[in-house]
C-alpha cells in the first residue's frame, strides 16, 4: 500500500485537473480511510478528487465529488435524487451517445467517455475513435454548454492534443500516470 500511496503522491504533484479514486476490490472501511487520506493530499495540491460511487465514503472524506457508472447513476437518480443534487460535482462514465446525453439531461456535471483508443486494460477492444468523441462532445454541449467531457481509454501524452482538438475538456490517463514518474 505504501508504494501505491507514493505513486498517487507523485501523480497529485503533477497537478492533474482531477483524480478519480476507484478501488472496487478494497474493503469498504479501508476505502473510506484511503479516500480521506487522498482527499487531504489532493486539497493541498488543489487537485479535485472524486470518490467512485460510494456516497458514504465521500462524506467520510469530506469530498463533494462523486463519479458513478451509468447504471449506478440512473439508480441514484431514481432512488436518491436529493443526494445527487447536494453533491458538488457529479461525474458519470458513458459508453454511447445515448448514455452521454441522458447523463447530462439527468444532471451530470461531467462525463467520462470511452473507450476512445484501444487500451491495455481492454485488449482487443477497438476504440470508438475521435469522430465519436467529437460527436458526443457536440451533443453533450447542446444539452448543457457547461458540461465537461473527458475521454478515457488509451489516452497518453502523445494523443491528448487530438483529444482536445475533438472538443473534449481533457483525458483520463490512469495507466500512464501509474506507470510513469
What are these regions (language model features)?
Residues 49-64, 95-107, 138-145, 149-151, ...:
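Catalytic cores of alpha/beta
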Residues 66-79, 112-126, 154-181:
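Glycine-rich phosphate-binding active-site loops on the catalytic face of alpha/beta enzymes
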Residues 20-22, 50-52, 69, 91-93, ...:
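A cross-family glycoside hydrolase active-site/sugar-binding cleft signature
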Residues 10, 24-29, 70-73, 126-137:
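Short, composition-biased local secondary-structure segments
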Residues 90-122:
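Histidine/lysine/aspartate-rich catalytic loop segments that bind and position anionic ligands
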Residues 1-65, 75-87, 181:
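N-terminal positively charged helical leader segments and presequences
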Residues 32-53, 78-96, 126-151, 157:
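Alpha-helix-loop-beta-strand connector modules within alpha/beta enzyme cores
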Amino acid at each position: 500500500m505504501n508504494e501505491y500511496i507514493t505513486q498517487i503522491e507523485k501523480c497529485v504533484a503533477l497537478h492533474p485537473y482531477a483524480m478519480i479514486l476507484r478501488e472496487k476490490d478494497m474493503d469498504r472501511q479501508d476505502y473510506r480511510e484511503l479516500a480521506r487520506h487522498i482527499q487531504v493530499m489532493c486539497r493541498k495540491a488543489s487537485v479535485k478528487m472524486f470518490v467512485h460511487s460510494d456516497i458514504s465514503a465521500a462524506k467520510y472524506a469530506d469530498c463533494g465529488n462523486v463519479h458513478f457508472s451509468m447504471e449506478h447513476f440512473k439508480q441514484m437518480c431514481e432512488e436518491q435524487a436529493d443526494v445527487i443534487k447536494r453533491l458538488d460535482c457529479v461525474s458519470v462514465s458513458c459508453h454511447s451517445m445515448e448514455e452521454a446525453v441522458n447523463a447530462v439531461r439527468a444532471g451530470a456535471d461531467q462525463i467520462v467517455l470511452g473507450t476512445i483508443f484501444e487500451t491495455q486494460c481492454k485488449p482487443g477492444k477497438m476504440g470508438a475513435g475521435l469522430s465519436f468523441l467529437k460527436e458526443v462532445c457536440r451533443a453533450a454541449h447542446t444539452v448543457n454548454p457547461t458540461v465537461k467531457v473527458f475521454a478515457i481509454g488509451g489516452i497518453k501524452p502523445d494523443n491528448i492534443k487530438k483529444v482536445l482538438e475533438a472538443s473534449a475538456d481533457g483525458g483520463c490517463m490512469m495507466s500512464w500516470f501509474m506507470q510513469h514518474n
